């Protein structure tokens, strides 16, 4: 089984056909999208709606070719929650780049896509930002490090069942991202992961922009599509492949 990990898209529709071609070129069986599908520096309400309509069509086409697992990032959660709920109100206040005028349509489209908080193949854990030991002990139980990775994944995904539960990882923000709490798998910064990442697991994450796919602290960092506010790229657009032979970086343009 060949699994391709794709970093934060941030409403860049031009990336989608390039990712499809890379997946085809690499004979990909499964694709994991590492979250932050939504929002970008200068995207408008209408621009985000148009992007998400394009993304939805692209997702359906890709899901017809291979298994596709879309994960939620911190930028996606406000659109995932229903407008008018107390959970939505709490999350919206913490959402950088949120486009309220796009919420209704994007929320509607998201209901037809099976988003998750975490994914595992039984050996590795993929989340948007990474699982730290402190957050795991606090939110999953003091004995969570004794759990199989599938159970850790299941407990994280159960947070999607109730809006109030999803608020928990969305409001657990560490100092590196402007909070004062224990960083969650939606918010953990690369520096925070270096200090307390759960390294008894092999993790794959996005969230922190990197110049190229990086391996450090037994984790793979894959946010290579993000840009500066003027649109200049931070990363090289590389992707991560997991094959029977292990992990390796894949160029976006082959």
Task: Annotate the PLM regions.
Residues 253-254:
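Acidic, low-complexity terminal tails and accessory targeting/binding regions
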Residues 1-4, 119-125, 216-218:
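Beta-strand-turn-beta hairpins that frame and shape the catalytic cleft
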Residues 10-14, 39-42, 75-82, 132-134, ...:
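Active-site environment of divalent metal-dependent phosphoester hydrolases
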Residues 58-68, 101-122, 201:
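A structural motif corresponding to the C-terminal end of an alpha-helix
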Residues 6, 11-100:
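Core catalytic region of metal-dependent phosphoesterases/phosphodiesterases
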Residues 6-7, 31-35, 70-74, 126-127, ...:
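Active-site neighborhood of phospho(di)ester-bond hydrolases with catalytic His/Asp-centered motifs
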Residues 186-250:
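Conserved beta-sheet core of the metallophosphoesterase superfamily
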Residues 93-101, 115-195:
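Active-site-proximal loop/helix segment associated with metal-binding centers of metalloenzymes
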């Amino acid at each position: 089984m060949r699994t391709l990990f794709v970093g934060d898209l941030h409403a860049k529709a031009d990336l989608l056909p390039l990712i499809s071609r890379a997946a085809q070129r690499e004979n990909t069986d499964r694709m994991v999208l590492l979250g932050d599908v939504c929002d970008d520096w200068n995207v408008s309400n209408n621009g985000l709606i148009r992007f998400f309509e394009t993304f939805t069509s692209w997702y359906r086409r890709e899901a017809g070719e291979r298994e596709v697992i879309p994960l939620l990032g911190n930028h996606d959660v406000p659109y995932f929650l229903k407008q008018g709920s107390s959970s939505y109100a709490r999350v919206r206040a913490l959402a950088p780049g949120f486009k309220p005028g796009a919420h209704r349509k994007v929320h509607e489209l998201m209901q037809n896509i099976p988003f998750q908080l975490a994914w595992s193949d039984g050996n590795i854990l993929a989340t948007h930002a990474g699982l730290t030991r402190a957050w795991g002990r606090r939110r999953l139980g003091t004995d969570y490090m004794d759990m199989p990775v599938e159970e850790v994944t299941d407990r994280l995904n159960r947070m999607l069942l109730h809006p109030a539960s999803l608020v928990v990882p969305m409001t657990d923000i560490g100092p590196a991202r402007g909070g004062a709490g224990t960083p969650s798998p939606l918010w953990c910064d690369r520096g925070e992961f270096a200090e307390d990442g759960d390294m008894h697991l092999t993790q794959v994450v996005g969230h922190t922009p990197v110049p190229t796919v990086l391996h450090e602290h037994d984790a793979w960092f894959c946010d290579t599509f993000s840009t500066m506010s003027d649109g200049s790229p931070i990363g090289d657009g590389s992707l991560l492949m997991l094959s029977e032979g292990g992990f390796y970086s894949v160029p976006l343009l082959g």
